[in-house]
């Protein structure tokens, strides 16, 4: 591919459409987070003015529960000095930099993230437009790579700073290009492999790579006069090898503490999280999650070698908890465990940095179970993020599933809530256990469009126990966190209601599939049904009241706008929350 061909997706027409789509989201989410305060105009439109008061943006919007703004993209216009100007997302952020709290230091990096997000949208606009009715009948990975929006709340949600255009085309999930991972041999003096109960290193690696590939890799080491027994194998994102390890870890390579063995044989597809790969050659094999020193949505996407040591133990602990709890088991909940992990510790960088430094997160990997072997006849898989996916005609994937199922919208929603929400509620009330249950972290098991059960993933890095008195095994202790009492329920109110149900409810209502009041009534009924089935937790239900009239508005974009390179202080995650006023609880009246 020539340099010119690599940017063929960047045309004036697609750039204009991408800018309009991004401004629609920016106006909606910044109004939701009260960064901007659109004022009503006599003609029924809304207006937002730039910091200088001279530039204005006008648009129409529908307002839903949870102060959700659904902005009509085609209605947005930009005005200055009595004339209309072309839409430009970059100009928008410069014109409202003070309103958005963008510092001189953060602004250019944020603009780079916005530019990257726009470029990604341009590429997506070149892809064949697949109606959601067709997508609803597609396979697991066709749905995964068919997602177009990314995180529904974050405006700059496809920054991926560090990727050049050739990297984007090779590794972005939406390009759906097959990837072969690079494998390194890492000397055991600095590397460690940990695994769940009953897993041995040799048999596990043989199962993932195959005997022939392992023998080939061992042969490369022997040719260099090295003993394969002294090394552990680590899968590496190709970008990480070419751009980081081959340079930043040059001393390790030169001294044969790291040996590049080349690519493996299996082909993988990048998932929405960009650093996790699904094995398309053998779908029953494990996902591989790799370290990737790329800045995306407020964090460098590395993997801590130190954290990898406890990862399998945390997963085994949670899997046992789910297996032994009759309520969780009755919902069909399962987790796909991170069964094994490997990490490499660069001792010199460790001596020079604190434990949260990106330099300690450059070389590690984990293997996560595939959900494919657990499928029963007639079942299929879809990322939960797909529910809020909307096609070019404005139709949602959720609506397509409802139609496909033959159920009424309320019946379909009840099944989904039992599979997804009930386990979250029970984990919270029975164990003070919380997840990061956004759309990309949950896989839905479907049968003829109906949700049968949910699969939670990304366990070790995302779950937390908020009970200071909980008895945890020593290896699991790191998931205990201190959270102020008055913010504990935000794990449901923010992560579930505001960051996912808000979008799903508004979209289904906008399509005329299910009225907003009916949506939230069904959620309330689902909560009541769970509470009535677990009367032994009545005191906890009173202590943490899901039917409280209002709850704090926790703002995600404000975190990124404040510091887009380290969005949350990892030493005090709850202390980083940006709480701005309150939202009316949509289930309080039921």
Per-segment meaning from a language model:
Residues 421-425:
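Short C-lobe core helix of eukaryotic-like protein kinase catalytic domains
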Residues 426-431:
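Protein kinase catalytic-loop region centered on the HRD/HxD motif
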Residues 1-419, 446-590:
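Nucleotide/phosphate-binding site architecture used for ATP/NTP-dependent chemistry
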């Amino acid at each position: 591919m020539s340099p010119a061909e690599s940017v063929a997706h960047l045309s004036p027409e697609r750039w204009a459409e991408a800018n309009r789509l991004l401004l629609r989201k920016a106006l909606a989410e910044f109004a939701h987070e009260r960064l901007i305060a659109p004022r009503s105009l006599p003609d029924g439109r809304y207006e937002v003015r730039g910091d200088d008061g001279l530039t204005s943006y006008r648009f129409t919007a529908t307002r839903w529960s949870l102060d959700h703004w659904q902005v009509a993209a085609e209605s947005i216009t930009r005005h200055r000095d009595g004339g209309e100007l072309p839409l430009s997302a970059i100009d928008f952020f410069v014109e409202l930099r003070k309103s958005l709290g963008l510092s001189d230091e953060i602004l250019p990096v944020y603009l780079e993230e916005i530019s990257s997000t726009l470029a990604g949208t341009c590429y997506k606009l070149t892809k064949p437009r697949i109606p959601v009715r067709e997508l609803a009948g597609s396979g697991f990975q066709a749905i995964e790579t068919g997602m177009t929006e990314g995180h529904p709340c974050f405006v700059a949600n496809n920054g991926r700073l560090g990727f050049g255009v050739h990297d984007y085309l090779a590794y972005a999930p939406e390009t759906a290009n097959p990837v072969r991972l690079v494998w390194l041999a890492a000397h055991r003096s600095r590397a460690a492999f940990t695994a769940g109960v009953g897993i041995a290193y040799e048999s596990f690696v043989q199962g993932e790579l195959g005997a022939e590939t392992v023998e080939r890799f061992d042969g490369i080491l022997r040719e260099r006069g090295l003993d394969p027994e002294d090394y552990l194998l680590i899968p590496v994102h190709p970008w990480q090898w070419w751009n980081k390890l081959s340079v930043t870890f040059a001393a390790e390579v030169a001294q044969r503490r790291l040996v590049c063995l080349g690519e493996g044989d299996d082909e993988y597809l990048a998932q929405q999280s960009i650093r996790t790969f699904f094995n398309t050659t053998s779908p029953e094999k494990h996902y591989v999650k790799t370290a990737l020193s790329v800045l995306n949505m407020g964090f460098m996407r590395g993997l801590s070698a130190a954290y990898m040591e406890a990862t399998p133990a945390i997963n085994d602990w949670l899997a046992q908890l789910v297996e032994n709890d009759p309520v969780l088991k009755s919902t069909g909940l399962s987790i796909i465990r991170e069964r094994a992990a490997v990490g490499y510790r660069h001792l010199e960088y460790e001596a020079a940095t604190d434990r949260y430094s990106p330099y300690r997160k450059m070389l590690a990997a984990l293997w996560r179970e595939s959900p494919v072997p657990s499928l029963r006849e007639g079942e299929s898989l879809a990322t939960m993020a797909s529910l809020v996916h909307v096609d070019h005609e404005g139709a949602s994937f959720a609506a397509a599933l409802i139609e496909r199922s033959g159920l009424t919208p309320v019946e379909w929603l009840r099944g989904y809530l039992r599979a997804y929400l009930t386990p979250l509620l029970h984990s919270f009330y029975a164990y003070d256990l919380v997840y990061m249950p956004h759309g990309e972290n949950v896989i839905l098991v479907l049968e003829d469009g109906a949700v049968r059960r949910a699969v939670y993933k990304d366990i070790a890095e995302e779950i937390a126990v908020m009970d200071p008195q909980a008895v945890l095994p020593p290896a699991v202790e790191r998931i205990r966190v201190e959270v102020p009492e008055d913010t504990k329920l935000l794990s449901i109110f923010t992560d579930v209601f505001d960051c996912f149900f808000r979008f799903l409810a508004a979209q289904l209502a906008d399509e005329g599939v299910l009225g907003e009041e009916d949506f939230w009534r069904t959620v309330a009924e689902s909560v009541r049904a769970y509470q009535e089935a677990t009367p032994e937790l009545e005191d906890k239900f009173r202590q943490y009241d899901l039917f409280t009239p209002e709850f704090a508005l926790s703002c995600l974009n404000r975190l990124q706008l404040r510091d887009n390179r380290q969005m949350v202080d990892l030493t005090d995650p709850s202390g980083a929350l940006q709480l701005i006023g309150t939202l009316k609880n949509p289930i309080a009246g039921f």
